[in-house]
């Protein structure tokens, strides 16, 4: 039941990502190239007027990493800053090296939300830039266009670990709804629990090596458990 609820949320998330935004597109300034594991102070202007209807529905925005797996469309895959005050225009962002393959074409995505709400409202995207210094490999699930990692729940510091969960437990498309799918979902949730930042903002770059080490350990533990 928990897995079915999770899959329904992912489907709803995917459909929402495909809808055009009804708000003014934010101005997001990105460096080119964008270095992995480096702390950036990004300028993000939501351009919401003081009397905008948006303010009745939202008082913050979430910042995501958006990827484009080969052969598929672009969409948010993990969050970089969970809650940013709607009028804040400078956001500290670090993209972990294991979040995407090297030389990936990436975007930064934002979405409005009420503080404390688990899910956001619609998505806007920056222009593209290239991620350098990264070391991830596309999982088969991503290449199949069937990733079950929820960008609202999984931070980019837990995303590499969650990708390992998918690689460990999903070997065929027929395994998504049975016991293996349940194990994969539990593994992904554990990654988020252990590696998501405790605060609403981005993690300071000085702690990145420690976080990556923990991600490797968690992924290894689940990999061993999967073959026992």
Feature locations, PLM:
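Solvent-exposed serine/threonine-rich low-complexity stretches and specific carbohydrate-binding patches
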Residues: 74-87
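C-terminal GPI-anchoring signal of eukaryotic secretory precursors
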Residues: 172-180, 184, 188-213
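Short, solvent-exposed loop/linker segments at the N-terminal edge
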Residues: 32-40
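Internal, hydrophobic beta-strand segments that form the core of beta-sheet-rich folds
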Residues: 100-120
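Short strand-edge motifs at loop-to-beta-strand transitions and within beta-strands
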Residues: 89-93
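Beta-sandwich strand segments
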Residues: 115-128, 174-180, 199
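Fungal secretory targeting signals
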Residues: 1-27, 202-228
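Short beta-strand elements
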Residues: 118-157
């Amino acid at each position: 039941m928990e897995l079915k609820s999770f899959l329904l949320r992912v489907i709803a998330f995917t459909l929402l990502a495909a809808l055009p935004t009804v708000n003014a597109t934010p101005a997001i300034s990105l460096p080119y190239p964008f270095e992995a594991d480096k702390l950036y102070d990004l300028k993000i202007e939501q351009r919401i007027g003081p009397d905008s209807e948006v303010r009745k529905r939202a008082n913050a925005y979430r910042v995501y990493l958006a990827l484009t797996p080969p052969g598929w469309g672009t969409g948010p895959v993990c969050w970089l800053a969970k809650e940013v005050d709607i009028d804040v225009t400078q956001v500290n962002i670090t993209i972990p090296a294991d979040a995407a393959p090297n030389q990936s074409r990436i975007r930064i995505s934002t979405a409005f939300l009420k503080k404390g709400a688990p899910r956001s409202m619609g998505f806007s995207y920056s222009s593209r830039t290239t991620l350098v210094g990264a070391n991830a490999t596309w999982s088969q699930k991503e290449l199949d266009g069937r990733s079950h990692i929820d960008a609202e729940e999984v931070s980019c510091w837990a995303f590499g670990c969650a990708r390992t969960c998918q690689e460990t437990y999903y070997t065929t498309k027929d395994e998504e709804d049975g016991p293996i799918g349940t194990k994969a979902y539990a593994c992904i949730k554990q990654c988020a629990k252990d590696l998501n930042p405790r605060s609403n903002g981005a993690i300071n770059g000085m702690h990145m090596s420690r976080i990556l080490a923990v991600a490797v350990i968690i992924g290894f533990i689940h990999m061993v458990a999967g073959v026992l």
